[in-house]
Amino acid sequence: MGTELFNQAKPILEKIEQHGFEAYFVGGSVRDYLMNRHIHDIDITTSATPDEIESIFEKTIPIGREHGTINVVYQGTNYEVTTFRAEAEYVDHRRPSEVYFVRDLKEDLQRRDFTINAIAMDKNFNIYDYFEGDVALNQHIIKTVGDAKERFKEDALRILRGLRFQSQLNFTIEGDTFEAMKHQIADVEHLSIERIVVELKKLIKGQNVSQSYLNLIDLNFFNYVPFFRSLDMKQTKVNSPISFELWIAILLTVEQTNTSLSDLKISNNEKTKINQYHKIMIEMPQVSSKEQLKLFVYDYGMNNIIDIIAINSILEDNNIKIASPLIFNLQSIKEIDQHLPIRSRRELNINGGDILRITSKKSGPWLKEVLRQIEIDVLTNKVPNLKDELLKWVKENVKI
């Protein structure tokens, strides 16, 4: 199972070997192959230096030359090829002060984070496992390569990566490894929020998120991270996979706060999505009629509302009041969405300029209120979305 990507990349290994160097598949792709999981990306490790890789292949991109990584472009696909390397002491709990190249596979593998990620495989699917990674896979255990405290001291992100693997793979964190996490957890404050968010997005969607989330709480992880440290995270529960945006919206709703999302350094689209989810969670329980539901679907979008309904159990776990299932059911929501006369204010056959012309009034907050009322009346079928009818509505309802 899952040999196709390896076979596609096999000629790269063969070409490196033809020039007298070693080359292996390594890391997550090998781990997932051994677990019969879907394989996303292929990483290659080699005894050849970046200069030697660039001389072997016609098309390369030096994406991380200083760290030994060259992108080899083969048949339209990019493959990261990294030289066997060892690392000097780490600085700032996140990066080595120096990287130097070696010619020994075992020396390269021993610098990696967890035993399940320190397994290599050659072009013929022979496994090279010096640190009992396969044993850990069979026992469903997350365990560091070598001394756990040293691994986490080198790069504190490995703590979060370990919890992320626990969530994604449904594994258990080995006892000494978890104790080392506790010992080094304060080092998390040295990490960039961007690196943390990348890992949290994967962790929160994992099949074993409930245990990983409890471990995050137990480790006091959130006390060391901007945005989260201002929230009472011990109040929150996540017992099933959820998107990052939904999770953050739950935190805001539980805390009854509008804490700024700027500390998370996420995209504007993600911020917008979180704020929409947050408003839906707050306002949903107040919707008590089909007419109100129609406006709600128009304002927030069918898909966003369905996203919230799908996590009702998580909302209840967090003592967030859920919407009435008699009103908020998939059939009603889809039916309303299908028959909405307009989907945005832009679809109204009247605009602010039209209203100003027939009222001879100056623009102001009143104009926005009038347009909103027109939206409501069109959506509730009190007036058709026809220009003449809408102009007539303005003359009858707006004092000139």
From Swiss-Prot:
Binding site for CTP: 28, 31, 112, 155, 158, 161, 164
Binding site for ATP: 28, 31, 112, 155, 158, 161, 164
Co-factor(s): Mg(2+)
Main enzyme class: transferase
Membrane-spanning intervals of the chain: none
Keyword Lyase: no
Purpose of the protein: Catalyzes the addition and repair of the essential 3'-terminal CCA sequence in tRNAs without using a nucleic acid template. Adds these three nucleotides in the order of C, C, and A to the tRNA nucleotide-73, using CTP and ATP as substrates and producing inorganic pyrophosphate. tRNA 3'-terminal CCA addition is required both for tRNA processing and repair. Also involved in tRNA surveillance by mediating tandem CCA addition to generate a CCACCA at the 3' terminus of unstable tRNAs. While stable tRNAs receive only 3'-terminal CCA, unstable tRNAs are marked with CCACCA and rapidly degraded.
Annotated NCBIfam families: PRK13299.1
Protein name as annotated: CCA-adding enzyme
Provenance organism: Staphylococcus haemolyticus (strain JCSC1435)
